[in-house]
């Protein structure tokens, strides 16, 4: 304003200034005052009595007037009753009268306004009050008033109001006695209804609607409108990052998001500085942008609303590289190490330090040590006496900082390691020589001098040589030499540490003018017959050298040679023998004479291919499919090296030699198997060295043995008459004859009339040289089945298909025959009587009578006339079956026969046993066998034998044995002694006569047995035995080892192993933890020697290293680790390893590489070792043995380790050969060596010339880029793959550009005027990618190069053909040469005989016997027929009847009442009787497993020794075209009274998933029982064969998982199965028991029994067999089947037959119930089931069950509840279960001396170093219903253990603690207060800070923050203390306690971590047991609808003693469970 004033108007300006001042001091001067004015007058009102009257008055003025109300001239006060005065903005005043009263309120009312300016103004109105019904007509009446409403903020509400009157009343609304302002746009009024939109909190209040017309005014009743507002305090939905690390100068956005209701404002602060302006604070989200950050800072995000404020701090940390360390100091300097120390003054966020060092001034890279976390380090492995410089670098998470200043030092001296170099000697005269040298290369110190040694006799020790000391100069002169003598000179250097090694000897001749010694004499190129020598001429030759003298001798001919050669520095010495060691030396000669020679150097010539084939090749056909082949090596003089392999070729005669099968091996014998039957083979052999194959031997022609033939062809049968049939046939097909057909068998069998089933005994007719035969002696009018079988020498073959033919009728039918006994003694006589046939078909002419012993030739008699109808037979044999046949005859012929069988009574045998045979098993063990007496003398069934055996001189005073077998074994016989043997037989009637005395004489000299036999387990399946060898005297062939788990006398029942001339052997495939007896005998040419003493070994490794593993196996190294032996304390460990591998080299030759054995000795504390310098793809035999303190022998533990494959070795480049037809290029392709792994395939890659490819090498062309693809653009000159060649089929020559396809790659046509390069890529057969080697590029190739030369194309050398013709050397034949003829013959004879013996033994053990007399041995107990239903007899009982083994006889079933005592007897003496009983289990039969051993089935077996018996295996329907598709490693197993109740199988492999599910489908199985986890002890036990989610397809089976339930000890999975082509869906449940420990058996059987009962409950009765598997399908699987079957047996019988059932199972699958521990566990489980019974109750029956428990039954003294609780207490406590708890250092930590945790379930704490017992706390892990170790049951902590209690909670992540006691009860301390009350307290490492305490009606909840002071981490722990448990007894009701349990578990689910809930009372067993029991019982009721309080407590007591301590507590568990059920209708109704 001042800027606009001008000088022309000074007066106006002045006036304005004065006015401004006056305005500031007296503002009224400017603003004029206004008197009051009423702008709204009150209106007259008429109201009902009791209604509401409201007068409104408004006034204005300046200043605003005040309004008062007057009634009848008197002021109305707002404090008066019923009168209210309300003042509102805008000068409005309201007078409200409520309720109005007649006679008191009807009066005039005046509104008076005044403001001190002018006079007061007023306006009045009259209130008229109508009583009752005196209201005027038309008075408004509200017909619908508003009601109370509740809405949420933001919603719309409609307040209703309707009124009537005349005139129509006007309606308006009052809120909180004030008229509603309808100018608010959210308010609207329609037809009297008030609508409020988008409601707000201020809309809440009391509302009235008012109806008004000229007749009066009516108010509605006041009603409330409530507006609900969600009030949520602010929280961060996305708090800012706690810490952000950024680089210096970078940018960062910090986001902070908060929510709440109302939404909070969000702002950022840096310290106390606001970074967000108040007027710009965003709601909900705020992003802070930090730009060019220069410093670390704390930023705080604050979110605030009306309900509070929260904040979160974000640290922005600026990162930078660390500074350099300072003050690097060096100390403790030694010859090979120094200690560095340094300081660091930078920030503390370093990760580690790096030390760099190298010799100072050396031109080499720094060595580096990384990862140092201290500020000192000892640098080792330095070179002695070397100046080093060191740098230290600090490293943080950004990177490395700058290096420190260098620190230098010189390492100390040490003993010298090298000798003086380049020693040179020359003669100055014949008596003086001068010697010069150079200092040692690594003196390791300062050289102080030298000592020169010289002598004329170098064989003397150096101490006897002449010597001369020299200072540190490098030259000296020696005088007074003997002229013409040859001196040897050596030089030795000295340092302060002493003398170093001597130099290499140098020779010189003390003669002036002769040359000195040539130097550097060496062999540079060594061949098979020649060697190239090189040397350096003498340094001092004085005169010119005229020639050299070369000397050599060979170790083959033991001859010395000498040759004079010309003056040069190289020479090739030839004419040598291959593979021979030579010593070669050299001297120079001048005109004066010959100088000193060089030292002899050893040179071995290379090996060469053998010059002769193997000798004495012998072939023997050992069966119809095998040939045994043996040979001797080639003659030694023609081997040309070490023979490392042999190749055997065999081919059928008539086929080409190149079709022969080749076998490579490193032994001199082999059995060729899987040959064709009765087929001629041509066989030849060659030998090979490392160079290649030698010449072939002359072929041998040999035919395999005969076999049984196939079935005859075109069989026809025609009836000739009523008793004869003509049969004709053709021989079997040529391919099926399998030998010379020597005849035929015709089998005729009578059929029943209806054609179903056979009748009477079959007929068999032998036919020799014809193809037709008349079968006679048949019955008329009878159907017969006719079959024909061919015969070879091996027996009769397959029968032809049966032909049914019927003989003609018309002959008499069968007569009725009866038989009666006439006499029994002294002879047997019977009378046969018959009746006339019912139909004779003509005149009956008589009868034919045939009779005799059954299966013998029958006598025949014709009886004429029909009147003869009886016949007497006298003098019949005793004890045999007679057959009598009677038939009538008519004019047609003989009629049908009636057969009558009669068993004659038995008598005593009439003769002795026959065919007595003796055999010495060893010289002192005799085996005698015999047959029963001959049939005519047998007189009945032989029941036993009496055997007498004694020395001849004892005159019958020997032993007598009663035997049921026809075999006796006698041991410990004396040498050169005669023994007498005789035997007699018994029938039921008594004994027969003894046999004649058989005299047996033992050898005169049995020789001594092997001594000092020892055995020791080397693993859980192997053992090693060793012994002192027997003095051979030239006759010893080897040894035979006998071993068995049952040490019977008969060595034929022992397992055997034959070994050669050795002193140790390994026994494999032994039973884990089983006890074996072992003995050994020497093998001589004439048999075995005396048997050694027997030793026993338990297959439990104790003195060998355990858990030998190979880790980190690479191409050139492996790391071994092992554990120490259990018993032995070693002083060292010894590692030894060797290997041999055969591979094909780059020329196609088979090479054998032998890695010699290496040994490594390690200290006893070393448990891991890395072996380096290994070869790729080589299988090493690794042994680790523990060396005891006496250094005696201990066997090693062994593994085989194969190193990784590597890329092939480099190849040569492809070569050009020539252009063919102008279109193709013939190239020669290289082949790669397979030394580092088998080659999978080769690629031939063509690279057209292109600028982009000129500088690339072949390896730069990636295979993926070369492979054709749809999305790859084609470049005109792009490289491509022209061909792919499979393994070993790469051609030597190849036509490039032919246009042909090679394994889906096209050999494209070549273009003219374009150049190409090619290379070959060899790919190793390994899953790893890019493991290949590429050859170099070929030269550039094009079609305009030269044509290919004419003639034969080049070819790769044939590895089967010798490279050079055989060279023969003529030698003088003299007498000693005879030895070279005789000796090989002797050796070959020995080898052949040994091979035959081994072959026989192996064949006897491997091949099942197929002869008829073995049928009873191999016949299964029952055929595997799936369709068979339950049999009337139990399969175990049937086995006891049919196969009475000694074990079954001596182990009968046990009555249930005696079972507990029986187990106690078996467990006595450390389970000795259990061991004996378990080891005696033997099915008494031999079974085959041929299908498992078929080559195509071997990969389907998880373990090689666990196979499926053929007779009981599960046969799947074969898939057409798939060999072996009917096989799965599974067997049917019998249950109780149910055949094939189970299928025992192995854990499925990846390749058997389809077979497994196919088996489930085919068998209609509904239940799979899985007894293993997928992985145990880091070993794969079973592959996951089911889908984790969704559906998986297994072949034609679709498996869908529909439900998974995981419980503490088992899991249940439900699957739906569909099959392709089938409409039905099937449900299968899989129950997996997960509580079986990795090692051994479960500690207690109760969880397993619970699992087993669940399995049975979920298995439908009509389903197929239950499939049970573990890993091998024999151990745990057997346990399940036996226990399940025994539980079923107990329901129906009063006996237990575990022994019988295990025996039965072992006849159906091998190794069932695999260990003794499993066998004992079965007994314990059955005893547990007997003692406890079945206590599981359906939930709906709980009330009835509880009532029964509380009743004392008649005749009983205690109730069922007491009985159950007493059973719980019948658990024997063994002090060995509480080892740690009873230690003296832990006893004070136990509140009660008898409540201690079991060792197996106690809670382990991390031990504190130096504090004994620091790992102990009195607490136990307890399993819940769904989780293992879900709870910790602990005692109330004592004062000494409070710190351990918090340590337990922290280490095991337990964040919920349940306390069920008060600190003191009944005046005694029950628990120490282990928690802080008001402030934080530290318990050892942990700081416990109380957060809050909540007092609930029944419990207290305390929250604590627990912080680990070591790292600052923290977590919240909540403690629930139940305070309603009475100090005595139990709660009256369980309802409160159940609610408490629910609250604890609900909190656990919401806030708890994965750890267990810790529960404690005082002792941690009583109330704690109740809490855990009810938790489990209630949860199980929810899931299964059943409960089992007894078993639940029983299982708890197996984890902690005395759980649920009193009977009251036990009863309370039942009551609480019942109360819980009462809240559910479905259980109570």
UniProtKB/Swiss-Prot annotation:
Compositional bias segments (type: Basic and acidic residues): 1346-1358
Tissue specificity field: Selectively expressed in a subset of axons and pioneer neurons in the embryo.
Subcellular location(s) of the protein: Membrane
Glycosylation sites: 176, 253, 298, 553, 616, 666, 721, 774, 915, 962, 1183, 1304
Domain Tyrosine-protein phosphatase, first and last residues per copy: 1474-1729, 1761-2020
Region span, Disordered: 1346-1369
InterPro entries for the chain: FN3_dom (IPR003961), FN3_sf (IPR036116), Ig-like_dom (IPR007110), Ig-like_dom_sf (IPR036179), Ig-like_fold (IPR013783), Ig_I-set (IPR013098), Ig_sub (IPR003599), Ig_sub2 (IPR003598)
PTM-bearing positions, type Phosphothreonine: 1572
Cytoplasmic domain ranges by topology: 1403-2029
Disulfide bridge positions per record: 57-111, 161-209, 256-301
Domain note: The extracellular domain (1-1412) is sufficient to inhibit bdl function.
Family recorded in the similarity comment: Belongs to the protein-tyrosine phosphatase family. Receptor class 2A subfamily.
Stated role: Possible cell adhesion receptor. It possesses an intrinsic protein tyrosine phosphatase activity (PTPase). It controls motor axon guidance. In the developing eye, has a role in normal axonal targeting of the R7 photoreceptor, where it negatively regulates bdl. Inhibits bdl cell adhesion activity in vitro; this effect is independent of its PTPase function.
Protein name per its UniProtKB record: Tyrosine-protein phosphatase Lar
